[in-house]
């Protein structure tokens, strides 16, 4: 009857509004780190870099890279907002593993000077990953941002990269709050937060790890967490590598 039709219409409108709100939250979450990188470089230039050509050139180049990444990121977030299942159109894209990992770690060292970021690079040569560079950067930023956010007194993050015959493994370890055992399997669910009150104080909204997980799944990779409550968490990310006998 008319009442049922009206209620159905309201449900559709409510669903659409929720999707729009999710999109705004997604974009806000994902743009925060690149904005911080640009702000850090501009602040450095404002203090002493204007008269140093080397610092000026380096900061401008890094800022331009982040602006370009932000523009691409907005389009990719539009894709994420349109469907729960990410459709990847970059199956032929390849990315240099060492280069990107070192770049992201250096960016975090600049943004969070109070933290110690230790990088153990066990790769003897560059490895080519079967993933779009912007997506790989996005995944690393999400997980490292999470490590920083939930660190406590011990402000350290350990990052290691190694490889087997088929995959690159990135391990990102913090020494913070940790995750209760019953929550570890659910942290990759969209909007899931271990402690909503605590997440609000830290700016968390339960989006980042869900996005990272979807992107990794789309490239036939894996991500999982090992955690000890009160001692910290290790995230392990596995991304397929291109073997030397494979065609570009």
Q: Where are each of the predicted segments found?
A:
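Short alpha-helical segment of the dimerization/phosphotransfer core of two-component systems
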Residues: 65-70
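A conserved beta-strand-to-alpha-helix junction within the catalytic ATP-binding
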Residues: 91-109, 116
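Conserved catalytic submotifs in the C-terminal HATPase_c
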Residues: 91-94, 114-127, 131, 165
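Short helix N-cap motif at coil->helix boundaries in the Bergerat
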Residues: 97, 178-189
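Short beta-strand/loop element within the Bergerat-fold HATPase_c
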Residues: 154-166
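Acidic ATP/Mg2+-coordinating residue in the GHKL
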Residues: 174
